[in-house]
A protein has these predicted regions:
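Intein/HINT protein-splicing elements and their conserved insertion hotspots or analogous self-processing inserts
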Residues: 1-98, 109-193
Length: 193
């Protein structure tokens, strides 16, 4: 897994879902400091996709990096991730996990690692190696020797229970409960032509 930053900005919590959960908005919001860099990062990711190098990917937006990682795992019924945040440097873990600076996380097969790095380096786009998939149904995050574990299935239940409560109020067909009771039994299968 690799983190590709589109903002070229410091990690900021203003305007984030995290700030809102604390009844704040904040004025220190992430911006895109360099539009040309943003374009180059976007184009580099498109090259990766067009060459078939991306096994999985997700944008970093509402909820930040931790939400991105969780959402990448929610659709699967097996496996997790081992993630190291040490390459983010001196940033605190709250900002690393919850800042909503524009970017993406992509999964690249080991056999394509050199080609991935060449494409990114040739485009002048920064990236950080985050980690790799695991068999265990957890996202294990380490930073400066501290370890944090996020139970994917538990957090998926929390996530979907909120969606269910909203669906129950919005759905006119009375099927919200059936959808909620069934969501775990629908593994995601995709075929691309």
């Amino acid at each position: 897994f690799y983190h590709i930053d589109f903002s070229f900005d410091d990690l900021r919590l203003g305007g984030s879902a995290f700030a809102q959960s604390l009844n704040k908005v904040g004025s220190d919001v992430p911006i895109c400091k360099n539009p040309e860099y943003f374009r180059d990062a976007f184009d580099a990711v498109q090259t990766l996709v067009n060459k078939g190098l991306v096994l999985a990917g997700h944008d970093i937006s509402a909820g930040g990096l931790i939400t991105t990682l969780l959402e990448m795992c929610f659709a699967n019924m097996e496996g997790g991730m081992e993630i190291s945040l040490d390459k983010f440097g001196r940033h605190d873990i709250v900002k690393i996990l919850l800042a909503e600076n524009p970017g993406v996380v992509v999964q690249i097969a080991d056999k394509h690692k050199a080609e991935f790095k060449k494409i990114m380096d040739d485009a002048g786009v920064g990236y950080l190696k985050l980690g790799h998939p695991t068999d265990e149904r957890l996202i294990q995050v380490t930073k400066d020797g501290a370890e944090y574990q996020f139970g994917i299935d538990y957090l998926r239940d929390v996530w979907y229970s909120t969606s269910y409560l909203l669906d129950r109020k919005q759905s006119m067909n009375g099927r919200a409960k059936a959808r909620f009771e069934n969501y775990k039994m629908q593994p995601l299968e995709m075929v691309f032509n």
